A protein has these predicted regions:
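Extracytoplasmic/secretory-pathway segments with low complexity and glycosylation-like composition
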Residues: 1-5
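Positively charged, low-complexity intrinsically disordered leader regions
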Residues: 6-36, 40-123
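Conserved small/polar residues in nucleotide/adenosyl-binding loops
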Residues: 127-129
Length: 129
């Protein structure tokens, strides 16, 4: 019988988020400020997001953004997420490829959304919100 579940160790939790825009040859057009119709500036996002999140959102040059240690420690509650081999799907597709999915049900809320929400809460805590 083949292994269906693959569990990574805590030491394998990522240390940086990947920002794909930094590696794109053809970068997306800038987001326009709805009032001025000019390209949005980082500061325009401050009423909605913390400075840390705003900076990441507007960052088009750094491919890797370090995950703060405090966030990585909290990720350990449910990460790394188990990888599960989808042998039934492989068989249904009649493919020699190995297909895997991340089992996000081990997260306290049963989805990946907490990964982003936790980081946003962390950056807001830095400005005492």
């Amino acid at each position: 019988m083949s292994t269906k579940k693959f569990l990574l160790e805590e030491k394998d939790i990522p240390t940086a988020w990947y920002n794909i825009v930094a590696d794109m040859k053809n970068k997306p057009l800038p987001i326009l400020n709805p009032q001025t119709k000019q390209p949005l500036k980082e500061e325009d996002l401050y009423p909605l997001f913390s400075k840390g999140v705003s900076h990441q959102e507007m960052n088009t040059t750094d491919a890797w953004i370090e995950i703060p240690d405090e966030v990585r420690e909290l990720y350990k509650v449910w990460r790394p997420t188990p990888l599960v081999r989808a042998t039934g799907l492989e068989k249904a597709l009649d493919t020699p490829a190995h297909i895997y999915f991340k089992n996000e049900s081990v997260s306290p809320i049963g989805s990946h959304k907490l990964n982003s929400a936790l980081a946003q809460a962390y950056y807001l805590s830095l400005i005492h919100i």
